[in-house]
Amino acid sequence: MNKLRKLKRDTDHRQALMRNLATSLFKHGRIMTTEAKAKDLRRVAEKLITIAKKGDLASYRRVLGYLYEEDVAYDLFQKIAPRYQGRNGGYTRIIKVGPRKGDGAMMVYIELV
C-alpha cells in the first residue's frame, strides 16, 4: 500500500497545498520547494499531465477542477501535454539544491522535463 506524506497538515490544507504547487509548476515550469513536497507534487503533476494528454473535454474539466487558474489549465492542454505525447511518464525532474538556511530542510527544484 502506498503511504502518503502528511506534511504535518490536515487533509484539506494538504490538498490545497498540492493544488497551489501544481498550479505554480505548470505556470512557471520550475519551482523551488522542500524535497518532501516535491516528491508528493511529482505524483500529482504526472497524473495531471497524463489526463491532459487525452485532450478531450472531460479531461479538460477534470484538470480545470484541480488547478486554481484557468489559463494554466489551458496552457497544460495546448502547450505542455503535447510535448509528452510520445513519453510514458517521467515528465518531471527533481534537482537537489541544498539545505535551507533557517531550518536545514533539503531544498530542491522540481521542473518539467
From Swiss-Prot:
Q: Which domain of life is it from?
A: Bacteria
Q: Does the keyword Ribosomal protein apply?
A: yes
Q: Does the keyword Ribonucleoprotein apply?
A: yes
Annotated signal sequence is: none
The protein's assembly and partners = Part of the 50S ribosomal subunit. Contacts protein L32.
Q: Which HAMAP family match?
A: Ribosomal_bL17
Tell me the protein family, please: Belongs to the bacterial ribosomal protein bL17 family.
What name goes with this protein?
Large ribosomal subunit protein bL17
Organism annotation: Caldicellulosiruptor saccharolyticus (strain ATCC 43494 / DSM 8903 / Tp8T 6331)
What's the encoding gene here?
Answer: rplQ
